[in-house]
Regions:
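N-terminal Rossmann-like FAD-binding beta1-loop-alpha1 element of flavoenzymes
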Residues: 3-29
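A short, basic/flexible loop-to-alpha-helix module at the beginning of a structural domain
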Residues: 1-2, 110
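Conserved N-terminal/central alpha/beta ligand/cofactor-binding core
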Residues: 35-128
């Protein structure tokens, strides 16, 4: 079997990457079980987004602390700073995050986060 790109996994990151590769590539995704059994699909929580620059330092510290300061700081910075664009991509792909009555995105606080910066879809964010 010949392929241009082999992606191991079928979770959110793998799917997002596949969607951002050139369409003329032959892409093969390999997963150990059905996609519906991936951790991403089964996830009930949400996805974090930098709401504004004032939250950057807190978001960075929360992420580093949750990773016991073993995280790669550059990767954490890249993840945080790119999160608004990633969320907009997901919305453009049709992900239906919860909204407030005024139509703005609804945020909640979960886990190690000190601020409300989690977007979610009901209690089935991974399926969405």
């Amino acid at each position: 079997m010949k392929t241009d790109v082999l992606i191991v996994g079928s979770g959110c990151s793998a799917l997002y990457m596949a969607l951002h590769l050139p369409e003329d590539l032959n892409i093969l995704m390999v997963t150990k079980k059905e996609a519906e059994l991936s951790d991403s699909f089964l996830a009930q929580g949400g996805i974090c987004m930098l709401r504004n620059e004032d939250d950057y330092d807190s978001y960075f510290e929360d992420t580093m602390k949750a990773g016991h300061y073993e995280n790669d700081a550059y990767s954490v910075e890249l993840m945080i700073k790119s999160s608004p664009d990633v969320i907009q991509d997901l919305i453009n792909y049709g992900v239906d995050f919860e909204r407030n009555e005024d139509g703005s995105l609804a945020f909640t606080r979960e886990g190690a986060h000190s601020q409300k910066r989690i977007l979610y879809h009901e209690d089935i964010t991974g399926k969405e």
